[in-house]
Design a protein with these regions (language model features):
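Bacterial N-terminal signal peptides
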Residues: 14-25
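Exposed aromatic-hydrophobic patches
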Residues: 542-548, 627-631
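N-terminal secretory signal peptides that target proteins for export/translocation
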Residues: 1-9
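Extracellular, repeat-based ectodomains that mediate carbohydrate processing or recognition
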Residues: 31-495
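Extracellular/lumenal mature domains of secreted and surface-exposed proteins
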Residues: 491-492, 500-514, 555-558, 564-661
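Short beta-strand segments within Ig-like beta-sandwich modules, predominantly Fibronectin type-III
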Residues: 533-540, 619-625
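Sec/Tat signal peptide C-region and signal peptidase I cleavage site
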Residues: 25-31
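Short flexible loop/turn segments that cap and initiate beta-strands
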Residues: 521-527, 607-612
Length: 661
């Protein structure tokens, strides 16, 4: 007997629909240095710039001074969702002139501002107080000013430095110059000065007191280059550094850890010798960075006069291991950050700017004879020094006073960072050079300037936890200045996509994702299936994929997040297993043509064996297995009917005509 098979199947056809021919490259877009925008000005009423700050979530703001009815007051422009908002006045209840404003930022749009203002007179001289005000998360106006320090004397060269954590705590360090005192004057021109610190716990300010180690000796006359600096971690711990002379008259750099509302002991942070020979020149321009675990990195400038063991002025760095290390009780020892500086004793070295990422890698930027020098390092030590980017360019005022331009640099937590310094465009017009370093080692640079142009004044940089940075500065001559800002924009941060695990029916394919962190919202999301874009509702964080777009098999799902500037991040592919077809049935001749073999399988969700039912057409039935053998007793025409079901419930029926001769 020879069996011939007429295959007639009553199973649903799976139709594959043509998708849009849209190719996507699964890569993270680079950050963009956006054009500068003028926040306010040019105006004769703008009389000072106080800095910029950016929180980990990408919100932030800048602060500056503007005269109202002839009196200088504090103004802030907030940065929210990738846009600068109209400036608002901070000191609305104060009638006296403000000075020395500084700003800090925390998540949710929270801002803290401090400034100095007169409140009384003594011996016909003004007595200033240091005030602070807070704009709460989601707020639109600053609260009433509170006293940080009720008496900072005349507020001359207070030079506050404010650091704020993502959790809303802040520290401020500032100087108070006394006219009278019993301190020993070590050098002509020295002053009687206190370096003070205050802590903000999120609700109120607490004065921690004076950090100087020797109140009985004089300090160098206050300048921007010898101003104290402070850094803070998310838990409220931090560090303060300052310049203070020793009894022999040489000014060194000192440091103290901060533990919330308490001060730790004083630690020397600068070198007293080099190559076994003493260093007898002043150290100045301290810069400090601090990590979550409590590691601190201090950089400073060391002068070198005649007889110095140094070949010329140099930048030194010193490491304070984190609080979890046994060696975290003292600095490791100051070392020269960059020995390749030309010019000998006459080299022009600018103040350093240093920062750390969460991997405890450092980046230091400074001006070496007009060239931007970048020093990098890891927990194993300094790893390289190089020059890249437009040159430093002095303003006319800096040239007249033989001042070297300052740089400012911040690192992103995962590596890379943003740096800025005064420079000039190809035509010689003043501009700010911006450098973006990426974690993979790539670099981009650019020049930014306000629309009205003019000389570059004070300059500041802030950074988020998302790879973004803010650059802000005062531009223009006194009496016609502007406040200018620019953003170094990063694509949306990587985010989590949730795809159901295991085999699914097409109707069960629901894709969910968490919102991507970005400073440039609102974001739009697009689901990408096997490289093809699917229509995704605006504002959605989930999508039920149309079953018609899903054939049986393994698919790749990604989600594309795009910010307001068109920068996008595409997630890594996630596997989506779809089973929309019943098990496969095979019927073949067997037993020399006198019988058939029926086999059933399912390579996707698996076969429900107990649901398998076979009718051989001659009255014989079987089930509950994956393979069946049957011999027909006599010639004839028979219809084999096989009913199957998989573990998802996909059912199928196969009918085949079998002829036996």
């Amino acid at each position: 007997m020879i069996a011939t098979i007429d295959r007639r199947r009553t199973r649903t056809l799976v139709v594959t629909f043509a998708a849009l021919a849209f190719a996507l490259h699964a890569q993270l877009a680079r950050a963009v240095i956006l054009p500068a925008v003028t926040i306010e000005g040019p105006s004769e009423e703008i009389v000072g710039f106080g800095g910029v700050a950016m929180a980990e979530d990408g919100t932030g703001g800048l602060v500056y001074l503007k005269r109202v009815d002839g009196v200088a007051h504090v103004f802030v422009s907030r940065y929210v969702a990738g846009h600068w908002l109209a400036p608002i006045r901070v000191d609305t209840e104060e009638s006296f002139a403000a000075g020395s404003p500084r700003i800090g930022a925390a998540d949710g749009g929270e801002l803290v501002v401090v400034w100095a203002t007169p409140f009384a007179t003594e011996d016909e001289k003004p007595v200033d107080e240091l005030l602070g005000a807070t704009l709460g998360p989601g707020g639109s106006a600053f609260g009433k000013a509170t006293i940080v320090d009720p008496d900072i004397r005349e507020g001359i060269e207070t030079s506050p430095d404010l650091a704020m954590s993502s959790t809303g705590q802040a520290d401020v360090v500032y100087r108070v110059v006394e006219e009278q005192g019993r301190a020993t004057l070590l050098r002509s021109g020295d002053v009687i000065e206190q370096v003070r610190v205050a802590h903000f716990d999120g609700e109120r300010w607490t004065r921690l007191g004076v950090v100087n180690r020797e109140l009985g000796i004089s300090m160098r006359p206050p300048t921007e280059d010898n101003a104290p600096q402070i850094a803070i971690g998310p838990t409220g711990t931090g560090i303060v550094v300052w310049q203070e002379p020793e009894l022999d008259g040489v000014a060194r750099i000192w440091a103290r850890r901060l533990f919330g509302q308490s001060l730790d002991y004083v630690m020397p942070a600068s070198a007293t010798s080099f190559g076994a020979a003493p260093i007898n020149e002043d150290a100045d321009a301290p810069s400090v960075a601090f990590t979550r675990l409590g590691q601190a990195e201090v950089a400073y400038r060391q002068d070198a006069g005649p007889g110095s063991p140094l070949p010329g002025p140099r930048i030194f760095v010193n490491d304070l291991p984190n609080g979890e290390a046994a060696s975290g009780t003292e600095f490791a020892g100051a070392i020269v950050a960059d020995s390749s500086v030309a010019g000998g004793k006459g080299a022009l070295i600018g103040p350093p700017s240093i920062d750390l990422d969460e991997k405890e890698s450092l980046r230091l930027l400074y001006d070496a004879n007009g060239t931007p020098r970048v020093v990098e390092g890891t927990d194993l030590g300094l790893s390289g020094t190089f020059s890249l980017g437009p040159p430093f360019v002095q303003s006319k005022e800096q040239q007249e006073h033989s001042e070297v331009p300052s740089a400012t640099s911040v690192m992103n937590p995962e590596g890379g960072g943003v740096s800025a310094w005064p420079s000039a465009d190809p035509s010689g017009a003043p501009a700010v050079a911006v450098r973006e370093d990426f974690p993979d080692g790539a670099v981009q640079t650019g020049l930014i300037s306000g629309a009205a142009g003019g000389p570059i004044g004070e300059l500041a940089v802030g950074r988020s936890n998302l790879g973004d940075g803010l650059v802000a500065f005062q531009q223009g001559p006194t009496g016609d200045a502007s406040i200018v800002a620019a953003q170094v924009s990063a694509p949306p941060d990587t985010f989590v996509v949730s795809v159901p695990k295991g085999w699914l029916k097409p109707s069960q394919a629901l894709i969910k994702w968490l919102p991507a962190a970005s400073a440039n919202g609102p974001l739009t999301y697009t689901v990408v299936l096997d490289g093809h874009v699917l229509a995704t509702p605006a504002g959605a964080t989930s999508l039920a994929i149309d079953p018609r777009d899903l054939g049986t098999g393994v698919h790749e799902v990604q989600v594309l997040a795009t910010d307001a500037y068109g920068q996008s991040t595409l997630t890594s592919p996630s596997k989506l297993e779809i089973d929309g077809a019943p098990p496969v049935v095979k019927i073949a001749r067997a037993m020399g043509g006198d019988g058939v073999t029926v086999s059933v399988s399912d390579a996707q969700s698996g076969l429900d064996v107990q649901a398998v039912k076979v009718s051989f057409g001659d009255g014989t039935r079987a089930g509950g297995r994956t393979v069946f053998h049957h011999r027909y007793a006599r010639a004839g025409s028979y219809t084999v009917v096989v009913n199957v079901r998989d573990n998802l419930g996909n059912r199928g029926t196969v009918r085949e005509r079998v002829s036996v001769r």
